């Protein structure tokens, strides 16, 4: 069976531009490899500062009379050993290298920074809401590590499964390292939701925490995390939409970004309109083959003599890597472009010859972030409606128990449905996922349909079948949550 050749692009493109005036970068700043001739990570400055901090803590505990030196050492030993392993073994493996392969430093990514903000904001808000709900902030703090680890693994596994060919390397070790390189981005929100949800269920069952009520506590906070997370995608230059006209919902990325490279290989930035060559094999990474349908008169392709009806190979040219200073990462090198006809070079364009900015694409990251902010407010409004005091409930208890209420779990299910609808719509304007199962629907759209259907069925069951004043416990009994003796309900 023949398939159309698709464009495959090497990773390691950096930066993005919101407009011709405003620029954001994938790398916020670079922690240099060494300072004063001594490396910062590995056996270096960071390890020295860790040792000084541990000794200072032990000395402080001993002098204030609270703990003895041996007790203080035992308390901090586990943390110190783990931190030392990270600084000496893990972090050096994430250092970027120059064109000669020498380490130049550790990149602090905008993507990672926004993920950290997402974690802090969502957990902090959830802890506050849990305290108000009578569940206690500790219920969130105990749950958070499980959720984050499960979410991170789920998001990465989902992404690697979708794009496994991009991670294949000559050896198993190199392949596994590529799959584990989270500093390069590559997380799928749905995978994170699924992994985090499964891990959370395990933790909630273990601690006998009320699942429906804690879900109602958390779901608005998930959208806060989504808001920051999608801004991280914007910084990383991923999860963008298809081509569109310039406008308030459009973004433009600079040379070096993934979308810029895609538009080079598709011929758009060269002034070519065409269709892919049909073949059983995909072209090598960084190449595309196409039949020219038309050429813009004022374009680079027209200057190079490209004609309608020709079959061309367009390839990214990495030969300009040497232009990057040796104190900067090799990933900052901008590619040139080579255009070939029947294996003969038709034109060669240096990075300076090429457009410095890509054509507009839908800013799906911005759309998703705005929707997340709106859904956060909407869920709070729905929550207020669901928890209006009634004649059959104790007003004080209902006001205090801001989650659960007369319909525990409804708020969480509404959030699931809303995100499923959003994702289906966004996938229609995104271009980074192919149709699955013989349809035009992407894997995320299929998952969305399953989530929506399951949530609607569960919502109907919860709405029709839940007692307005109780929630079922893991053991099968009921615990009164409004107007009864127990303020904290048990879960499923």
Swiss-Prot record:
Enzyme nomenclature, EC number: 2.5.1.145
Keyword Transmembrane helix: yes
Molecular-function GO terms, alphabetical: phosphatidylglycerol-prolipoprotein diacylglyceryl transferase activity
Binding of a 1,2-diacyl-sn-glycero-3-phospho-(1'-sn-glycerol), residues: 230
Segments traversing the membrane: 40-60, 72-92, 106-126, 133-153, 184-204, 214-234, 361-381, 409-429, 441-461
One CC-aspect GO term: plasma membrane
Protein name in UniProt: Phosphatidylglycerol--prolipoprotein diacylglyceryl transferase
Any Gene Ontology biological process: lipoprotein biosynthetic process
PANTHER family listed in its UniProt record: PHOSPHATIDYLGLYCEROL--PROLIPOPROTEIN DIACYLGLYCERYL TRANSFERASE, PROLIPOPROTEIN DIACYLGLYCERYL TRANSFERASE
Organism: Rhodopirellula baltica (strain DSM 10527 / NCIMB 13988 / SH1)
